[in-house]
Amino acid sequence: MSLLNVSGISKKQGEAFLLRNINFIQEPSQRLAIAGSTGSGKTTLLKIIAGLVQPDDGNVMFEGTRVKGPLEKLLPGHPQIAYLSQHFELRNNYRVEELLQMANKLSQADAELVYKVCRIDHLLNRWSDELSGGERQRISFAKALVTAPALLLLDEPFSNLDAIHRSVLKSVIKDAEEQLNTSCILVSHDPVDLLSWADEIMVIHEGKIIQRGAPEEVYNDPVSEYAAALFGKYCVITPGLIRLFPFLENDKRRFIRPAAFEINADENGAVGEVISSSFMGSYYEVEVALAESKLTIYHTQNILRGEAVRISIQSV
């Protein structure tokens, strides 16, 4: 049996559609990510799945049972689905342990495992107003996990976190999946968060799913320029680019990522001029002007502005 079956979900705000006929299935332990621009309907979809927002049409089935909306029950939500908002809040004037005990549905041993997984066992005696942003996020995560959810909906969990706390929270999510058997749906604006984690990515645009697939497929073969832009820099295959690289005329791709280009000494390569070179840590991001195109290329070495280079491209 599928963990989650979303069928025909639509939601309007006034005359405008927030979601249009959303359909998908999530299997147990499947890592499902949702990508889309601000206002595309991602948060509304998560809240409908959690039973916090009433859909206008369609059904959400969780382990074979329909998830009721807030208009159908006294207390909104589903006991086995936890929604963690990017706008998390913790009550003031409480110790961390007290906040967690209010929500806890686990045995003491299982609750202690959650605290360990979330890296908060040393924070239990702290007051809620004595916590850093990263600590508050992990405690909110633990507060969701102690309700014993089978499905965790993560809405921009890494927003407003520095690199260190982002890394810690990613490890916490991984351990929750592996040690607590929790399935997750993740929404993030950072393509690295989604591409490195997901088994499958859904791309939403104006309330509709426009693409679904493995991270490699969604990244390398986006269905539109909108989908391409969500996951980083790209180059549109134009007639001018085809004139420089004739084999592209038979290429199925509409867009090419920077990693597909190479700067080398190939005599058959197209000649370009370096516009800029920026150090990105493990590589340089090089902007190159060609006769009819401008390309972004990832390269291992710095190249001076104005230098002439030859560009080749990987065929498929």
Residue ranges: model-predicted function:
Residues 66-82, 218:
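ABC ATPase NBD coupling module
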